[in-house]
Amino acid sequence: MPLRVYNTLTGSKEEFVPINPGKVGMYVCGVTVYDHCHIGHARANVVFDMIYRHLRSKGLEVTYVRNYTDIDDKIINRANRDGVPYNEISERFIKEFDNDMARLMLQLPTFQPKATEHIPEIIALVQTLIDKGFAYQSGSDVFYRVDRFEGYLKLSKRNLEDMQAGARIDVDERKEHPMDFALWKGAKPGEPYWESPWGQGRPGWHIECSAMSTKFLGETLDIHGGGKDLIFPHHENEIAQSEAASGKPFVKYWLHNGFVNINSEKMSKSLGNFFTIKEILESYDAEVLRFFLLSAHYRSPIDFSDQNLKEAELGLERIYKALAGIYERLASGANTPAGADNAEFVEKVAGFAGRFGDAMDDDFNTALALGHLFDLVRVINRELPTASTGLLEQAKAEVAKMAAVLGICDSVPAAFLQRMKDRKTSDIEMSAEEIEALIAERAEARKAKNFKRGDEIRDLLLEKNIVLLDSAQGTTWKVK
């Protein structure tokens, strides 16, 4: 099936047809680098990394641009608070961001421009808007005339008059209209600045993205992405700037990811439920966090909680255990004739790529795609002892292709599972090896019908919050 995406601009799913056949230009708004990144940043960046991977898996040549906003009021305020130059703050948190994204296994974008490296392009774009009558100078500032652009608010489906009537906006004598926004800000004493035709100053937030996206991708982009919180005002203002300057549509497909809630409440610093990526990764493996973020459809809200992270951990372990089983079986050299393979397993393996691809082509439905993967894992676990080597190799290859699109299961299965065991036992007084030894002793006791000793071992482990799970495949354990 063809790839279909939900376009925020039209409010509907549309077939994705690149402007230039075989090539895709994608711009995603990056972070303002003044502090550590939080779980909301993690979701947006993991989502668009997944989209980038899927587009490339379909044979498309993708130019992916993700910027850094490295000059902004928040950066200046943080620098003043810490008593350091603004660029010391921005460079520090660019490195922090890059480290967070590497841990979450993001592929590098094609370009990662910084706003401060594109001041000439920004100044030229502001001048174009002034020349065309869409912007005006007021003192050392330059503002955009929102009522001059006919398509203003077409992305957010708002009404300018209603917004003006309902808004509590302080009167700003510098502006012609209360909703006009800054393209260029005159420098205040002690602030960083650049020379411009309007005096010393720095760019506004919105103009940076218009200038950088068009420099690297041209006047019309295939995809522009970001969180839903950016629809207004940021993306709305980007459209106004870019289309007024070029006279052409700015973006063909607008994609926006949903919010992250914390224990069913909106995340906010004021509620005290604000978590940085670094804080989360102190308690959970980075791959588990990535898996969790992809477990829901990217446009849906997702609820961050310890329970949901633990469920994601168990889900990822199920996949890795199935892969570990395949590796062990293949390493054993045992073989079964292909003709003896279970028909359901043959069908699940043969049809997996199509089902997974169809789910991903339906507006990047990772939740459905993972459902198909768990169907395959279930059959792998059941048929592992008797399946032919060829079918197991095929199953392993199919899972690897899926994993490459989602950016998961990149570790050696045994190493990942050991990492999980070590993490789980870090807060208890027993190592994974000691637990496994007791499980082996319990199995021998039960085999010898010494059920009393078996129960003693079970109870001993339970006292240390370790729960044993018996199944036909053997005994596993988890921390309560």
Swiss-Prot record:
Taxonomic superkingdom: Bacteria
Q: Which keywords does this Swiss-Prot/TrEMBL entry list? A: Aminoacyl-tRNA synthetase, ATP-binding, Cytoplasm, Ligase, Metal-binding, Nucleotide-binding, Protein biosynthesis, Zinc
Residue numbers binding Zn(2+) = C29, C209, H234, E238
Annotated cofactor note: Binds 1 zinc ion per subunit.
Which cofactors does the annotated protein need, by name? Zn(2+)
Single Gene Ontology MF annotation: ATP binding
Q: Which residues bind ATP?
A: K269
Q: Where does the protein principally reside?
A: cytoplasm
The UniProt annotation puts motif 'KMSKS' region at 266-270
The answer to whether the entry has keyword Kinase is no
GO terms, biological process: cysteinyl-tRNA aminoacylation
Q: 'HIGH' region: where is this motif? A: 31-41
Q: Which reaction does it catalyse?
A: tRNA(Cys) + L-cysteine + ATP = L-cysteinyl-tRNA(Cys) + AMP + diphosphate
Which SUPFAM superfamilies did the record assign?
Answer: Anticodon-binding domain of a subclass of class I aminoacyl-tRNA synthetases, Nucleotidylyl transferase
> Which cell locations does it reside in?
Cytoplasm
Name the Enzyme Commission number(s) assigned to this protein. 6.1.1.16
Give the multimer and partner information: Monomer.
UniProt cross-references to PANTHER family, sorted A to Z: CYSTEINE--TRNA LIGASE, CYTOPLASMIC, CYSTEINYL-TRNA SYNTHETASE
Q: Which family does it belong to?
A: Belongs to the class-I aminoacyl-tRNA synthetase family.
Q: What is this protein called?
A: Cysteine--tRNA ligase
Native organism is: Citrifermentans bemidjiense (strain ATCC BAA-1014 / DSM 16622 / JCM 12645 / Bem)
What taxonomic lineage is listed for the species of origin? Bacteria, Pseudomonadati, Thermodesulfobacteriota, Desulfuromonadia, Geobacterales
